[in-house]
Amino acid sequence: MIAVETQFGCLGIEEEDGAITSLVWDGHTTGEKTPLLIEAGLQIRAYAEGRLQKFDLPLRVVGSEFQKQVCDLMSAIPFGYTRTYGDIAQDLGCPAQAVGQACGANPIPVIIPCHRVLAASGLGGFSGQGGVEGKVALLRHEGAASLLI
């Protein structure tokens, strides 16, 4: 794991077999700093500094096929834009609540931007540091805060 200090918290990034598998808050650097972890750290820092809008990293989502589909659709949401749980549910032909649960179980937040998925009636939840306030901070960083009004 490599840890990167940002205004959103200390983000810990893990890799396994050449792919990023996890991002956690309150991370600590442990083990070998592989070239992929170093690159992921550079990209997280560039994102936090406003110099990167789209991550270019190999990712591996460990989870059900449904979880992977939701993560793929979240990854397709551009920087500064949002979608609703209902939008994604409609794409997949499933209930919005199932999409919300999959968003909450996202193993690679920020890189897979679950913060860009909102409830139809407002923000919805956020499993990252700071809860909904953390989600708002990420959306403000991306210039999407006007969508919250």
Segments the model singles out, each with a brief description of its role:
Residues 1-94, 141-149:
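Basic nucleic-acid-binding alpha-helical/helix-turn surface characteristic of O6-alkylguanine DNA
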Residues 74, 114-115, 138:
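Structural signal for hydrophobic
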Residues 104:
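Residue-level detection of the helix-turn-helix DNA-binding "recognition helix"
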Residues 110-119:
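Short Lys/Arg-enriched helix C-cap and helix-to-coil transition segments
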Residues 121-149:
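…primarily DNA-binding HTH/wHTH and HhH modules…
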